[in-house]
Amino acid sequence: MKKISLIGSTGSIGRQTVEVVLNNPDKFKIVALAANCSHGLFNKQLSALRPAYAALADENAAKKITEVPAGTRFYSGEEAALAAASYEEADIVLVAAGGFAGLKYSLAAINAGKVLALANKETLVCGGDLVMPLIKKMGGDIRPVDSEHSAIWQCLGFNLAAPFKRLLITASGGAFRDFTPEQLRSVTPEMALRHPTWNMGAKITIDSATMLNKGFEVIEAHHLFGAEYGAITAVLHPQSIVHSMVEFCDGAVVAQLSNPTMKLPIQLALGYPERAPTEGAELDFSKALSFSFEPISRGRFPCFDIALDCARAGGTLPCVLNAAGEVAVHAFLSGGLKFTDIARVIDGTVCRGPALRVESYEQLCETDARARAVAAELIAGL
């Protein structure tokens, strides 16, 4: 029985993790649960899971929790939520909290000696230079929950340090891969939230549409697998059946295929080395299957290009990139920014940098705050 602490239980990955756990009661048990402010859903999760420890970061939302199961200790506030990431009884901490805020939970889990099942992209995008050395120092274990990195992990025989020639990360291209520049100027939030193949949260769905998300995944792969950026290639694959591939020195390419469902990488990160049947993942080979790949030309997806430039520059610049992206996407979803201006805001913020060597978590917090202020200033001037 794997004992799990789930951080970010009310988001898209968090909800699917709860389903995986409830569908496998003989394999998994959630002993600690934390979320930000979605008190209604959190209340239901408390009743279904009956964790030993639970916390809502938002103290006002926590006041609306009406029923706490017997045996559950419920707390409120950011420190209480952070404590769930190092909860003593947990074997595995799955960090599904969104945004830069997820980094502090990942660091807490690593420092507590927990297995880190990582769904939060920003942990490695912003803090990879801190996180990976810390894992090595602590003798820790990190397991990817992103479908692309889980696919690579599987192709490498579950060995993050296995040798390879090249990593091939697939991308659907998002909802607007075939739109003209003129059509893109008319994109609304409602249009952008309809992803062609994946069911995801709002922020990551917009990042998929701009392809910023794929740039993040390249940065994550660099840190997770020790890959030079020249050995990572992103390719368009509209069908989202091949989740990533690994090319080896002899020319062989190994791929991982399944129907698009996040439940597969979730249950694998929790259950490794065992596998379990996953609802919705199985392909039907009694029917014809076809899929395609095509290169991503520079200039087609400006946010992707900016992300790659930031990746190669390194240091604190990926943290600036992420902060600008979070602010720009929030403004777009709120109706305060055009879809095509997301890239303008990100580029303008990144150009004001700086790209400093990553020294500490506190430095990254300062970088994040500074970049958010710059992005907000740029949005106000548009």
Task: Identify the meaning behind each predicted range.
Residues 1-382:
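Catalytic, metal-anchored helix/loop core of enzyme active sites in primary metabolism
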